[in-house]
A protein has these predicted regions:
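Solvent-exposed, well-ordered amphipathic alpha-helical segments
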Residues: 36, 49, 54, 75, ...
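Short acidic-aromatic low-complexity motifs
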Residues: 8, 14-56
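Hydrophobic alpha-helical core bundles mediating ligand binding, dimerization, or RNAP-core interactions
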Residues: 30-37, 54, 74, 78-82, ...
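Generic detector of well-ordered alpha-helical segments enriched in charged/polar residues
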Residues: 27-34, 47-51, 75, 147-150, ...
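A solvent-exposed, acidic/Ser-Thr-rich amphipathic alpha-helical stretch
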Residues: 47-101
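A beta-strand edge to alpha-helix "cap/lid" segment located at domain peripheries
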Residues: 2-18, 81-171
């Protein structure tokens, strides 16, 4: 288990008393991110894990869906539809880098839609302020997920509902 953002910031002091740079706070955030994606049980446990590490007005931006703003929207408009579609979704951090208070995280997502397994890669750019994410922009190709959905007709209603909800949501 990783420390909370407050603990990570409290502990962000070198042994000589000098404050640590932003990279250490970002490293704590990335460790939490890796833990959160490694073995989520469901949408709620996933969101509960991330909640203390997200700004109240966090912006989540990615292709194919409208931006998601706020913790509640993260839960209801991002995580819940995603885990409804891919109940066994999990991810592995393959690498990361930081520039100041921005992390670039390479994430390999794996799961099953219907009976179709898929693997999808993304690079998330996460802006971190005071130990919490204020914005996440995902660079991804959703083709592997879409192919799994297309090959699993029983998943179509769930997928279509999530897409329609996204279209109805204001930008």
């Amino acid at each position: 288990m990783t420390a909370s953002p407050a603990t990570a910031l409290e502990n962000s002091v070198e042994s000589n008393g000098a404050p640590m740079g932003p990279s250490e706070a970002v490293a704590a955030w990335v460790a939490m991110f890796a833990d959160g994606w490694a073995n989520p049980v469901d949408a709620d446990s996933f969101c509960d894990h991330f909640d203390p590490w997200l700004d109240d007005e966090v912006r989540m931006i990615q292709p194919s869906i409208r931006p998601v703003v706020g913790k509640r929207a993260f839960r209801e408009e991002f995580a819940r539809p995603l885990f409804d579609l891919v109940p066994d979704l999990h991810g592995t951090v393959d690498g990361w880098s930081a520039t100041g208070h921005v992390a670039y995280i390479e994430l390999r997502l794996e799961g099953t839609v219907g009976k179709r397994k898929f693997t999808m890669h993304t690079c998330d750019r996460v802006k971190i302020r005071d130990g919490r994410a204020v914005e996440r922009f995902a660079y991804l190709d959703a083709a592997p997920l879409i192919k799994a959905v297309l090959a699993s007709p029983r998943s179509w209603p769930t997928f279509i509902r999530s897409q329609l909800r996204s279209l109805r949501r204001p930008t």
